Amino acid sequence: MQETATKISAVDFDEIRKEFPVLHQEMNGHPLVYLDNAASSQMPVQVADRLDYYHRFEHSNVHRGIHTLSQRATDSYEAARKKIQVFINAADENEIIFTSGTTDSINLVANSYGMTNFSKGDEVILTEMEHHANIVPWQMVAQKTGAIIKVIPVTDSGELDIEAYKKLLSPRTKMVSVIHISNALGTINPVKEIVALAHEAGAVTLIDGAQSIPHQNIDIQDIGTDFYVFSSHKMCGPTGFGILYGRKDLLEAMPPYRGGGDMIDKVSFEETTYNVVPFRFEAGTPPIAASIGLSEAVDYLSAIGMDAIETQETKLVEYAVQELSAINGLRFIGEAKKRASVVSFVFDHIHASDLGTILDKQGIAVRTGHHCAQPIMRRFNVPATTRASIAFYNNKEDVDRLVEGINYAKSFFE
């Protein structure tokens, strides 16, 4: 098994790029340019090797066996929880809940905390730029409880209207659930300020960190949020696994979301008592391999350094905006002063799906569509955008290929 991520004193991203085998192949006869990182990041060889090692030599169920192999798997599984606690600077490893992803994490909070604490007329504040995963669960709970959804509007530049947000807050506000970085626009929202204002109003907060956790240092205690959610596959880990951070006192007051093995204390046909946090929220056989894979991904990202990653990606985004700005007819959707990873754009006479198809024929992978964010598409009066999303293993040559590909595609519509 290879050592955890190569440590490079002055980070050499050209060397790091070599650790991603998927990037070194051809698609449709062209070298692959992967610019769909907001949908899913790629996996370095270190993470793939760690998963392979687990499946070959450690595979066993956790928490339930006295034999050595089970104990070994359990140790690796629970070590992941501790690593993630440290990675996001949570106060207690028992505040880390393993889920199937960001969507599952939000549903857990909505159904466990929301169904317990919302009443008719209570208010949940979201933003106009939310991913559907941070809209639909709250709508479903609101329909059952009589709660009301309020929405923070977005300005023409793609930024939240914070003054409008302040006016939305009221004594009836029970939850403020906000995306940290927009997957459709790239906007970095001022979550620390949003959380502080919510707390002043007596509300609880949830931050959707799916697009922020791969791109910058996350300090939960500094942000001050009550809940924070993210997915493994956005940060070089396996799919089907995610994290819910929850403030321990809130988690301890919340009922279980699902029933089954491991989340119980005692079971009879008359009654069941539940396990302690975090296990009461982790019913059934957990995604053991995925947790170990994310643990390795955390080691990998930490070895590079999140500050170095943020610096590298900021330079690439600035370069992409500069080069794309020179393309006649291209219009950006979302031009916030603070943005990360995502560059979203349209052409008035070229549909995003047509552009994406032509780019794919040149080996360039981008995302087209509404990006599971239909409300923000309606806000900007567009049916879809083309989204190029950048990771630390991308380079200027990838951006140049994108620009060349767009100019080639334009020739079909002129």
Task: Give names to the regions the model predicted.
Residues 1-414:
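Pyridoxal 5′-phosphate
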